[in-house]
A protein has these predicted regions:
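Cross-family detector of peptidyl-prolyl cis-trans isomerase
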Residues: 2-325
Length: 325
């Protein structure tokens, strides 16, 4: 599954209705479905952006030029449905980026899949403009973000963008995912690593003393009620992974803020074999503890951005937030 086009990826290094207009759907107090944006509230600049065309198709965007802001603003162009996004939530989205000074398109997605972009509302996330703009967004909505130069492109010069230029982002938010597993608690099994979580869902894993395990074990810590994953599913998840012998975290979604969700392709041979086996057939909304013996703590390495310890069992705690489809 493609997550970004080449053009959007290059830019990121630096940084159901038709004829939809740019009229904001914010209520008088600025809230959306009971959520009030604070990182990038609506303003005159974002309210001046219009985007015509059906959701999930490339929009025709217009606004008065030059458009410049010192603080990033967000307005809702098309209302969505469901719960408004808050800290730690994630979303797929289609994206068009324009130069606020010239009105010219800088980058645009393909609008032919679940979404070219994927992001989490988390402090320290790379795409600051989008991270701020997603606050309070809903699925199947369209939002306009007018970003200052820091949030939009980190004050860098790129493809005709000047250091002080503001950028305009039009996002079609396709699918949203919660910050953590929402299932019902299950009683822990004796002899397995113990798990405690913070309010944000970040797990702490305590490895028990005693014999190092040689068999594969999985335990539900929370049981979800959503659809089951399949062998070729793309699973949206947050996780922490620890080596049994040195009790050290070697991979985690919580390297920043409220944790950054990742998309795990279960059909990808680059995924650790035991992680893939443990996730197949699990319900969305579940939190899963996996103890993976060394013989299953392997992959072909093609999808690894971290170094996986060898010769030791691995322990994963995984929140299954959704399935990309």
């Amino acid at each position: 599954m493609r997550k970004t086009t080449a053009l959007l990826a290059a830019f990121a290094i630096l940084a159901g209705l038709t004829a939809c207009t740019g009229t904001s759907t914010l209520v008088k107090d600025g809230s959306i479905a009971g959520c009030t944006p604070t990182a990038a509230p609506a303003g005159a600049a974002s309210g001046s952006v219009t985007a015509t065309g059906a959701l999930r198709t490339a929009p025709k965007v217009s606004f008065p030029t030059p458009l410049h802001v010192t603080k990033t603003q967000t307005s809702v162009l098309v209302s969505g449905k469901g719960r408004a996004m808050t800290a730690g939530d994630s979303a797929f989205y289609d994206l068009t980026i324009l130069n606020g000074r010239t009105g010219k398109v800088v980058a645009q997605g393909t609008y032919d899949s679940i979404g070219d972009g994927f992001g989490t509302i988390a402090k320290g996330a790379a795409f600051e403009a989008v991270t701020k703009g997603l606050e309070c967004a809903q699925g199947n909505s369209r939002i306009a973000i007018v970003a200052n130069s820091q949030d939009g492109h980190q004050n860098k010069v790129y493809q005709g963008i000047r250091k002080t230029d503001s950028l305009v982002f039009v996002l079609d938010v396709t699918t949203t995912f919660p910050a953590q597993a929402t299932g019902h608690n299950r009683a822990p099994q004796n002899g397995l690593p113990s798990v405690v979580t913070t309010k944000s869902g970040q797990p702490g894993i305590q490895i028990p003393a005693g014999t190092v395990p040689k068999t594969f074990t999985k335990q539900l810590l929370k049981e979800g009620t959503g659809p089951k994953t399949k062998k070729d599913s793309f699973v949206v998840a947050k996780y922490t992974a620890v080596g049994w012998r040195d009790k050290t975290v070697f991979d985690s979604s919580w390297t920043i803020g409220e944790g950054q969700a990742k998309v795990i392709g279960l059909g990808n041979p680059g995924v650790v074999a035991g992680l893939r086996a443990g996730l197949i057939g699990q319900k969305v909304g579940s939190r899963l503890l996996l103890v993976i013996p060394p013989k299953l703590a392997i992959s072909d390495g093609s999808d690894q951005t971290v170094t996986v310890p060898t010769g030791t069992p691995l322990v994963y705690v995984v929140d299954i937030l959704g399935i990309a489809q």
